[in-house]
Regions:
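Short, surface-exposed loop/turn segments at secondary-structure junctions
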Residues: 29, 33, 53-58
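Generic hydrophobic, aliphatic-rich segments that mediate packing or membrane embedding
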Residues: 9, 35, 39-42, 46, ...
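Generic detector of intrinsically disordered, low-complexity, polar/charged segments
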Residues: 40, 53, 59, 65, ...
């Protein structure tokens, strides 16, 4: 996996995100459950396109889910105040209403396949599903405000994003980080970040690289923060 893998994946997924907006527009006068059902169908095709472009590497599976819902929310709100982050995130919650229960209520050790399903069974961690269903509070109240604050204080886009990413990591339970290590390591990492953030928003990246830690879930939330920031800036 390298930068070109991600570029190939992003290029393959661009039409999917356009489709998500169209689905939102087409179902804006229908129950949000209809929007979600159509999204899931489109998402399965997008996953296949991603794996085809990356030769089987998962680069954007989380983004297909979370940003797909975000794009459909924009479509549903396109006739109204659709560039206000709080309204968009509220619509995401409407689209995902009941998602955790519908996806996890019948899980067993035998039918749990994904890491998210297994972590829910073991620790009752709802992951990105819980975040989306709650209206992405980690984005609205943690990541996005820190991103805006950093930019307002003169940080460049990268450094403000780094500060936002670390804030997101301590504001959520990153299932990708747990899957790449274990829950004890995740908890210790969060505690380390909290201690470092008191001194500086830029910890040594070797803390993560040396242990092969990947906060992919928090990275997806950061992408949403950037998305909403640029969208609001254009309004």
């Amino acid at each position: 996996m390298d930068i070109f893998t991600f570029m190939n994946s992003a290029s393959a997924l661009f039409p999917y995100f356009e489709t998500c907006v169209k689905i939102g527009k087409q179902t804006s006068n229908l129950p949000a459950a209809v929007t979600f059902t159509r999204l899931r169908s489109a998402g399965k095709k997008a996953e296949a396109d991603m794996f085809s472009a990356t030769k089987g590497i998962n680069t954007h599976k989380g983004a297909i889910f979370s940003i797909g819902i975000l794009c459909s929310a924009l479509g549903r709100l396109s006739r109204n105040q659709w560039k206000m982050p709080e309204i968009i995130l509220k619509e995401c919650a409407v689209i995902a209403e009941g998602l955790v229960d519908s996806d996890f209520s019948n899980l067993t050790k035998e039918n749990a396949v994904t890491s998210g399903q297994k972590l829910y069974l073991q620790y009752h961690i709802t992951g990105i599903r819980g975040q989306i269903e709650a209206g992405l509070p980690a984005v609205q109240y943690a990541g996005l405000p820190i991103l805006k604050k950093g930019l307002a204080n003169g940080l460049n886009m990268n450094d403000a994003g780094c500060a936002a990413l670390l804030t997101l990591m301590v504001s959520t339970t990153d299932t990708n980080l747990i899957a790449r290590s274990d829950i004890t390591t995740q908890q210790k990492t969060v505690q380390t970040i909290k201690e470092i953030l008191i001194q500086t928003p830029y910890p040594d990246k070797q803390i993560f690289i040396g242990k092969n830690l990947s906060p992919g879930g928090s990275a997806d939330l950061l992408a949403i923060c950037y998305f909403l920031y640029f969208l609001e800036s254009e309004a």
